[in-house]
Curated annotation (Swiss-Prot):
Gene: hisE
GO MF annotations, alphabetized: ATP binding; phosphoribosyl-ATP diphosphatase activity
Name of the featured protein: Phosphoribosyl-ATP pyrophosphatase
GO cellular component: cytoplasm
Species this protein is from: Bacillus thuringiensis (strain Al Hakam)
EC number: 3.6.1.31
Keywords linked to the UniProt accession: Amino-acid biosynthesis, ATP-binding, Cytoplasm, Histidine biosynthesis, Hydrolase, Nucleotide-binding
Subcellular location: Cytoplasm
Family membership noted in the UniProt record: Belongs to the PRA-PH family.
PANTHER family for this protein: HISTIDINE BIOSYNTHESIS BIFUNCTIONAL PROTEIN, HISTIDINE BIOSYNTHESIS BIFUNCTIONAL PROTEIN HISIE
Segments passing through the bilayer: none
Pathway: Amino-acid biosynthesis; L-histidine biosynthesis; L-histidine from 5-phospho-alpha-D-ribose 1-diphosphate: step 2/9
Length: 107
């Protein structure tokens, strides 16, 4: 699984360095951060709808779209997958108990 994410992230980075005219990834990079963020917002909304509709197949598809667009944002901001994995490692085991986290309604 990690290799699949890594390959996707590397492909996105390659599109950023060497744009292909017909590439959707290139289109997002050419439009900039605002377009990428808008797409993330749209895809997150679709995740919520798929979840509320209990549509597992659609939820999986929309989650892939969210991950893809988040990877594009990371590449746009020059944040590596290794940076993300280091943060996941750092957090592993921390704030894992309910009492360790703030309540959602207080955010």
């Amino acid at each position: 699984m990690e290799n699949t994410f890594k390959l996707l992230f590397e492909t996105i980075g390659e599109r950023k360095r060497n744009p292909l005219p017909e590439s959707y990834t290139n289109y997002l990079f050419s439009k900039g951060e605002d377009k990428i963020l808008k797409k993330i917002g749209e895809e997150c909304t679709e995740v919520i709808i798929a979840s509320k509709n209990n549509d597992k197949e659609e939820l999986v598809k929309e989650m892939v779209d969210v991950l893809y667009h988040c990877f594009v944002l990371l590449a746009e901001k020059n944040i590596s997958l290794e940076d993300i994995m280091a943060e996941v490692t750092e957090r592993n085991g921390k704030l894992s108990r309910v009492g360790d986290r703030r309540e959602i309604d207080t955010l």
